[in-house]
Amino acid sequence: MTLLALGINHKTAPVSLRERVSFSPDKLDQALDSLLAQPMVQGGVVLSTCNRTELYLSVEERDDLQEALIRWLCDYHNLNEDDLRNSLYWHQDNDAVSHLMRVASGLDSLVLGEPQILGQVKKAFADSQKGHMKASELERMFQKSFSVAKRVRTETDIGASAVSVAFAACTLARQIFESLSTVTVLLVGAGETIELVARHLREHKVQKMIIANRTRERAQILADEVGAEVIALSDIDERLREADIIISSTASPLPIIGKGMVERALKSRRNQPMLLVDIAVPRDVEPEVGKLANAYLYSVDDLQSIISHNLAQRKAAAVEAETIVAQETSEFMAWLRAQSASETIREYRSQAEHVRDELTAKALAALEQGGDAQAIMQDLAWKLTNRLIHAPTKSLQQAARDGDNERLNILRDSLGLE
């Protein structure tokens, strides 16, 4: 059994590739079923966010393992293998465990130490448990990563300042507009990122917020909290002209805001500027919108420059966090090795018990037939001894023939010989 982590993220792939490799929530079960149908895959978790798509797997080791999994990923998303290979990373066993712990702790995030990723990892794990988690080692790896992430946040200052993609989006808005108290903001979506954006905007006393979402009920809960108006996605075209700032983050597979829609809004606004921040993957806003005069479009990747200013205060904490991850990875791998030994011990004990039961049954049968008890017991003891020491004896003889003193010493130690 081998643990794997493979995927792409904001550091290895542009948004144009990430959106093609992402797994939409409504097709996740189908993807997991397809993944587990691969003969070498024993269990799997798919983590797909705006900044990363990763597969965490428990697999049987084989020569073409990497090729087979890359082929599956490309076939599933209809990708050219060369396009993916240049951006794909591959971590195995110790490195896979360390990678997941770093991801869950926010150490591999676009915003160092951001807390949302832990919730996303937990959701990915929960989704995989709906009939897709078939490997206890993989499950234990995720549970351990959750506790490590909690330890990192408790024992370091990695989360001391409120820095996130949502915070960066609001920072961008405040840099462009001197005051948010005179602007109207349209939020598209009502997920966790938009919730954070809405709360940041409320803290900065934005004049008006409008929330457009596919389901009104979810949006209304957020709107009641932050004092916003709720509209349907179908109303965006008509209401877009009211918005000075548009921040969008949905799970839609297709763009929600098109170039023509923005052109009409700008015309109604008499070309008064609009800021559009698209933090969705796949993108919610057609890239061509950025070519329009007075439409200033920023994607997730564009937020990197803003976010970089907030990293300095977290770097010292990150060093501490990396130490924790290294320690916890080492402990987990020791547990994993012990599990492997436990399985060997169980097999060895089962084998010995089978020999014992077989020979005992024969001895009891001989006694029932009136055989000499002392002779039967001596025969049982002799046969049991020979059967149990047969395999170790052959190993000792082979080690001696090979001149392998190290193996001889290990065998002597394991047999309790001084």
UniProtKB/Swiss-Prot annotation:
Description of how the protein assembles with itself and partners: Homodimer.
Binding site residues for substrate: 49-52, 109, 114-116, 120
Annotated residues for binding of NADP(+): 189-194
Family matches, as SUPFAM superfamilies: Glutamyl tRNA-reductase catalytic, N-terminal domain (SSF69742), Glutamyl tRNA-reductase dimerization domain (SSF69075), NAD(P)-binding Rossmann-fold domains (SSF51735)
Species the sequence originates in: Escherichia coli (strain SMS-3-5 / SECEC)
EC number(s) reported in the record: 1.2.1.70
Biological role stated in the UniProt entry: Catalyzes the NADPH-dependent reduction of glutamyl-tRNA(Glu) to glutamate 1-semialdehyde (GSA).
Name of this chain's protein: Glutamyl-tRNA reductase
InterPro entries: 4pyrrol_synth_GluRdtase (IPR000343), 4pyrrol_synth_GluRdtase_dimer (IPR015896), 4pyrrol_synth_GluRdtase_N (IPR015895), GluRdtase_CS (IPR018214), GluRdtase_dimer_dom_sf (IPR036453), GluRdtase_N_sf (IPR036343), NAD(P)-bd_dom_sf (IPR036291), Shikm_DH/Glu-tRNA_Rdtase (IPR006151)
Catalytic activity: (S)-4-amino-5-oxopentanoate + tRNA(Glu) + NADP(+) = L-glutamyl-tRNA(Glu) + NADPH + H(+)
Swiss-Prot/TrEMBL site (Important for activity) positions: 99
